[in-house]
Regions:
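Insoluble glucan recognition modules
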Residues: 1-241
Length: 241
């Protein structure tokens, strides 16, 4: 079992009662939501009536209801709205976005997902991608956030990962911690990269790195003048001239 924690919401008022977890789900399995009340009583919740179908399905939780399933193996964010006793299951297929990336800020360049059950990690990787010396983030869902029902209105989940700090920071060849809605990553030099976003399923921590495999030298500064030297012209004694 995995414990749900406070959801990374965008601009939600204090006291918003939504918890959730990023987790890898398999299409050949199922799951329920186990709730333990203050007296230690356990209730298993399954699928009840559908509350909303877009942009992701939200359902009412039903005690003893049908277990939840997904159509495809993959990473999902499971959000539980405790105020209304509802559940939303959101596919989280990450890509890279930003003016450093091929699609600029217009869309996500797809990454390839892999799940390591032994190490309990999920990695999204893209290889041989050309990045400019600009900025980037990681994003899914085609938008910066995804809204789902809450108390007659909506709340928005951050669907982008950035640097775990207040200001933009360079992405390096060592993993740096990320957070939902975090600051942009800065690409230090233009070139061809292998970029990885990793999730540790045991801690819920995302981290990212970018390894340059070929530096772009097309914009390198060249000298304004060059000279030929040798026997035909005489060898100067002062090589600084």
């Amino acid at each position: 079992s995995s414990q749900l924690v406070a959801a990374p919401l965008d601009g939600a008022p204090e006291g918003t009662n939504v918890i959730g977890i990023y987790t890898w789900l398999k299409s050949n399995g199922s799951f329920t939501i186990l709730n333990v009340d203050e007296e230690g009583n356990e209730i298993n919740y399954g699928k009840g009536d559908v509350v909303a179908s877009t942009p992701a399905e939200t359902v009412a939780l039903a005690a003893g209801g049908t277990p939840f399933t997904v159509a495809e193996d993959g990473l999902y964010y499971v959000a539980m709205n405790k105020a209304d006793n509802q559940l939303t299951i959101i596919p989280a297929t990450f890509g890279i976005i930003g003016d450093a990336t091929p699609l600029q800020w217009n869309g996500e360049t797809a990454m390839q997902a892999s799940y390591n059950e032994t190490q309990a990690t999920v990695e999204y990787t893209i290889s041989d991608v050309t990045l400019d010396k600009k900025e980037m983030k990681f994003r899914y869902s085609g938008d910066w956030g995804l809204e789902f029902p809450y108390q007659g209105g909506k709340v928005k989940l951050h669907t982008n990962m950035g640097y775990n700090g207040d200001n933009a920071s360079a992405i390096s060849e060592a993993f740096s911690e990320c957070k939902g809605g975090g600051a942009n990553f800065q690409v230090g030099k233009a070139g061809v990269y292998t970029v990885t976003l990793k999730l540790d399923l045991r801690t819920g921590q995302f981290s990212a790195k970018a390894v340059c495999t070929a530096e772009d030298t097309s914009s390198a500064t060249l000298p304004e003048k060059m000279f030929v030297n040798g026997d035909a012209w005489g060898w100067p004694q002062d090589w600084s001239t």
